[in-house]
Amino acid sequence: FDQRRCTGGKTCEMACRDYHDLGTGPAFRTVHEYAGGTWIQNDEGAWEHDVFAFYVSMSCNHCTNPVCLRFCASDAIAKDDFGFVRVDAARCTGCQVCALSCPYHAPRFSEASAHIEKCDGCFDRVAAGLGPICVEACPQRALGFGIYDDIADHPLMVERVATMPDPVITCL
């Protein structure tokens, strides 16, 4: 995710919602806005500000050591051959422990299906040689997809987004 490119347009979120036919249910990818700052009038009467806003597009990180997988009592969560963390709906009991344990809040309980749903990495598209729909839909090219070591070598790689939990939680 290249935060400098994200304009908060939510095209990634909507493409995911459409592709997975999610309707108004839990979204697998969400764009969060973080904003703050103040306006103050200086001694000359002019207004000055330190206002800021930025966006973070979040989805399942398909962690190296997923906390959700560790806490799933029904063994409904597993990593596939591509490294995607996936939920087996037939095994999911809907207890929501995985959702409560995930530091990124990726697994979401669906009232309609009565089980956990989450980003599956568009495994079907990846198996066909395509990228995840969110990556391909972003007009600003703020999302990337590939081998972590290749992405980690990018000169603008950021290991941690200030507003999110420390990734060491899911890498040990």
Go through each PLM region and give its residues:
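Non-ligating segments of multi-cofactor redox enzymes
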Residues: F1-L172
